Amino acid sequence: MTVLLLIAAVVVGYLAVMSILTPEQFSKTRIAREAPIQVRLKEVAHVEKAFHDVYNRYAPVEELRQFLTDGRVFYVRSEGDYTDAMREAGINEREAAAKGLITRDTVWVSARDSLLKGGMTPEEFLQVPGFPQSIIEIDTASVAQEIGEDVVMVPVFRTAVPLSVYLADQDHKLLNTAIRDAEARYQGTGYPGLALGSLKEVKNTGNWE
């Protein structure tokens, strides 16, 4: 009987310790894994902006991969300053460029060379950091927005990684609780993971910010 009581005490003690350590470890693991994913989602948003500058819309994941493979982006090479004296003389910036007073040239360069660093491939860029078997989600849509008296359709995007991708190997009860808590945010419309952007409004920030 004494042995059984001792074993029971050990088991109870172990469970009590684990009830504290498991949530703590879950939280530490979540924070550590989310940090590089947050950085990557911001990088994806930067690439989406470059795509939008060229095409005036956003790209789903496969099209963004193709854009990074053989697409081009542009920048304006500037020489000379458009001065107050030019403005006061009634010369706008386009006229100043035509007169040779300033230079404004559009230069096209490789999207891959311009946007990807360190020799990273488009395929690697779109993988979830730490989980190369999973691809970052990218969804696109259009939302109505009032501009003056007009209503125009504005392109939007959301890039995201679910909790179930980067915490699949953690305690399932804690994971399911985290998913439910995330979904309950924003009046029940929260995303169960990390997400940047929105499909319902013009937004370019992450849900962790």
Task: Tell where the protein language model's regions lie, with residue ranges.
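Low-complexity, acidic interaction segments enriched in glycine
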Residues: 53-209
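Hydrophobic membrane-insertion alpha-helices, especially the h-region
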Residues: 1-19
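Residue-level detector of functional hotspots within protein domains
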Residues: 6, 27, 50
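Generic ordered-secondary-structure signal
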Residues: 3, 26, 83-87
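N-terminal alpha-helical signal peptides/signal-anchor transmembrane segments
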Residues: 34-55
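Aliphatic-rich helix starts adjacent to a transmembrane/signal segment
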Residues: 20-35
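Compact recognition or signaling/catalytic modules
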Residues: 1-2, 12, 31-36, 41
